[in-house]
Amino acid sequence: MKKHLIYIILLSAMLLTLCHGQTHTLSGLSPQRFASTIEGKPTSLYILRNSKGIEACITNYGARLVSLMEPDRNGKLEDVVLGYDNITDYHTKGQNFGATVGRYIGRIIGPKFTIDSTTYTLQDNGKGVISHGGNPGFANRVWDIIDQTEQKLVLRYISPDGENGFPGKLTTILTYTLLEDGALEVDFQATTTKATHVNLSNHSFFNISGNPVQSVEAQYLWIDSKKIAEYDQHKNVTGHFYKVRHTPFDFRKPHAIGERINNDNEQLNITGGYDHAFALRHSGDISKTAAILFDAKSGRTLTT
């Protein structure tokens, strides 16, 4: 199996820190390069910053986390998330870097589902599935800003009934909050007018070394999981779980990401590396730690 340069993608609340609406950024991003109009709505770059000077930048296009400046063990601030430095690339290159993905992250086969005896046919991407809620999805929408302070940004998107086949008008409120202790809270709230399926997520890619071209294979990862969602050869979930014991997916004892990534394993071969959903042992309890990532060179730790 070929060796892969990979980024860490964590699809839940992030315990690192965050940027506020000023005219300059520590990451070097220019707010002017995010000032545009997409589908008749203005886009901007918003900056959150705490008293320690830690900064995160967010754009309302896709409610995306654009940059996250975090200190290493010596206090040097570096960007630890992958992204572009302008709105045009986010709009045209089709990547979900830092985006809010919805209505449903992942794939739905068919693509259809049944709720209360009613079957809903969803948008087909040409491969018999709908992926990440379809196109355009939440990542391709310009969100409304409904509140902003020094350390908080609140965004809203209203998905109309029937968008990409999903039932119900879905109103999503997303709040980014930068706390004084250095934690970044990412909070989703959604209400619907009909019974529906919702699976929202942030799609940030992390490299906590602070160097976007450096492999993450030397970073140590711990995940509180005994099993993953099994994929078929087309990278669609089978509905079965795959036990991680005695496989490269067992991170219950922390080890380097690259330690087993080149092992001959059917699930690894399907995805070309680690790109799976880990079933947490404490499902539904957000007070429990799900995963910890550590970079020895920089001293940074990411906890979710």
Regions found by a protein language model. Name each.
Residues 23-56, 60-303:
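An exposed, glycine/acidic-rich loop-and-rim segment of catalytic or binding clefts
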Residues 1-8:
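Bacterial N-terminal signal peptides that target proteins for export
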